[in-house]
Amino acid sequence: MPNDPSDMNNELHNENTIRILISSDPHVGYGEKDPVRGNDSFVSFNEILEIARERDVDMILLGGDIFHDNKPSRKALYQALRSLRLNCLGDKPCELELLSDTSLTTGDTAVCNINYLDPNINVAIPVFSIHGNHDDPSGDGRYSALDILQVTGLVNYFGRVPENDNIVVSPILLQKGFTKLALYGISNVRDERLYHSFRENKVKFLRPDLYRDEWFNLLTVHQNHSAHTPTSYLPESFIQDFYDFVLWGHEHECLIDGSYNPTQKFTVVQPGSTIATSLSPGETAPKHCGILNITGKDFHLEKIRLRTVRPFIMKDIILSEVSSIPPMVENKKEVLTYLISKVEEAITEANAQWYEAQGTVPVVENEKPPLPLIRLRVDYTGGYQTENPQRFSNRFVGRVANATDVVQFYLKKKYTRSKRNDGLYTSAVEDIKINSLRVESLVNEYLKTNRLECLPEDSLGEAVVNFVEKDDRDAIKECVETQLNKQINLLVKKRVTEENLEQEISSIINDLPKISTTKRKDYEELPEEVSETSINIAEHTPVLKHTSSLLDHHSPLATSSSEHEMEATPSPALLKKTNKRRELPSSLTKKNTRTPQRSKEVKKVPARKLSQSTKKSDKNTQSTLLFYDPSSTTEAQYLDNEDDEILDD
């Protein structure tokens, strides 16, 4: 179980504790055109970064959805860049030592992958983030808005997923004192696809071989946490048990206290969003960020309530349970009087909530709470008269922030048990059907009765969503070209002649509907255990170079003939000091001199291999550190991307 490092003396705490501010889903740019709520996302995002600067953290870790729009406006980009520059740049030296080559996780190698190592800018607090479902890559070049933040040197964008059906998760290795951090990230992948990828053992997690029991393994994901449907979420049982901590993005409900998974033996923390993007129950909990203090393998989470978040109160009202309103033909006046009184109570409660969030911070004289968000969900089943929701809401213009949708009237529906899910997901599925009719759903409904011959329905549906919701004008064109190229390559590979060309094309077309409509019954039951995936060690074992203290410890897999070398230390150009950068105190720059005992069962690396890895002009002797999957004994079987394709239901 995690321990509280607050009992440690200050010197040990400073030298060996990695302090990480964790947050998720700031949705910068949400509602920016709203006359009342337009600046809410900018203010809350800036508050998070200010907390990081004031609390003197070592780094910031975000769980995705920095931006609300896939193509953020100039205003949203400006506000995000401004907050990052004001709070994360400075001459304070970063005490984190990078031990791995990050080219596998952070993309473009032409620019410095980790911003605090760049000699051209002074980064005091590095920001690490994965992308979410709102700011995911799209369009020509598959760029994300986070790529813009990275190329400016303000954010370290990691956890990219170039291939959905072959995901390799490589960590960023950081060290401070004797504390070693392996930072993993999986950016957002469509939930059904990621679910199937895990079930088919197409997700690989690479681990450091040396000192493997000393690494604190932290994973960041951006997926559905709760099971809305059988496959549209990421079960915790799919995540390997070598992790110590999981930062869960995408879900907006703030569960900052976290929960311990006794089966997988890791702690899951869901920070939630920093702004309410919908008037739903999950957004009502007070918004928090947290500071994760890691010392060795122990950690302690300090939660911090956000002060600038607009208060939000939601109340559920069932009129049939209100004794003062008898069901009769003429009861509209009584209903409206009762609902108005409930809105007044909610406004008073919201103001008290805002003052509570200020804590010990003194409130500026004459400062008033921001206009609150109020939502009444009213069940008027049983013959009750109501008023037009917008007309009712307009009574509170100037008193609430959402003066057009304060109330939501609905009639209670009888839920039927689904044979497929046996009633487990009925409520959630019904809510989805009522509240969120997506373009993708319309496309799928249309294609049920109008089958396509050459294009897979799911891919076309996803392309339509990207075209409509993410303004990706080339999405449909790219989808069509990609699928046609696959079929052409398949015909070429089969060496089809002109005589049987039409027959082969018809065969391919006839096979596509069978593949796309195949019911994956084997996916409906969760596995008892999902172990680390089976991979071919010879093909998937990149090498890291490490300091001479690791020279006496070698992996038995070091003789692999197809290792890929990764520089663990920055290039000499990145080690140059700038005029503004201050040197670290000598007490903070001492290396960990503990030498591990050599295991008797470990095979030595051949002399030839050692000589190749130690021929460096650098003063420090280098050795090798391997990533590998310890449970792997057989090579995983993969589908040929050009020949076969398993499509989602």
Curated annotation (Swiss-Prot):
InterPro entries: Calcineurin-like_PHP_ApaH, Metallo-depent_PP-like, Mre11, Mre11_capping_dom, Mre11_DNA-bd, Mre11_N. Its cofactor is Mn(2+). One of its GO terms (cellular component) is site of double-strand break. Keywords: Chromosome, DNA damage, DNA repair, Endonuclease, Exonuclease, Hydrolase, Manganese, Meiosis, Metal-binding, Nuclease, Nucleus, Telomere. Changing W248R: Decreased repair of double strand breaks (DSBs). It comes from the Eukaryota. Pfam families: Metallophos, Mre11_DNA_bind. Residues 586-596, 610-636 have a biased composition (Polar residues). The active site is at H134. CDD domains: MPP_Mre11_N (cd00840). Its EC number is 3.1.-.-. Residues 553-649 are annotated as: Disordered. Residues 640-649 have a biased composition (Acidic residues). One of its GO terms (biological process) is mitotic intra-S DNA damage checkpoint signaling. Belongs to the MRE11/RAD32 family. Forms a multisubunit endonuclease complex, MRN, together with nbn and rad50. Core component of the MRN complex, which plays a central role in double-strand break (DSB) repair, DNA recombination, maintenance of telomere integrity and meiosis. The MRN complex is involved in the repair of DNA double-strand breaks (DSBs) via homologous recombination (HR), an error-free mechanism which primarily occurs during S and G2 phases. The complex (1) mediates the end resection of damaged DNA, which generates proper single-stranded DNA, a key initial steps in HR, and is (2) required for the recruitment of other repair factors and efficient activation of ATM and ATR upon DNA damage. This is Double-strand break repair protein rad32. It comes from Schizosaccharomyces pombe (strain 972 / ATCC 24843) (Fission yeast). The gene is rad32.
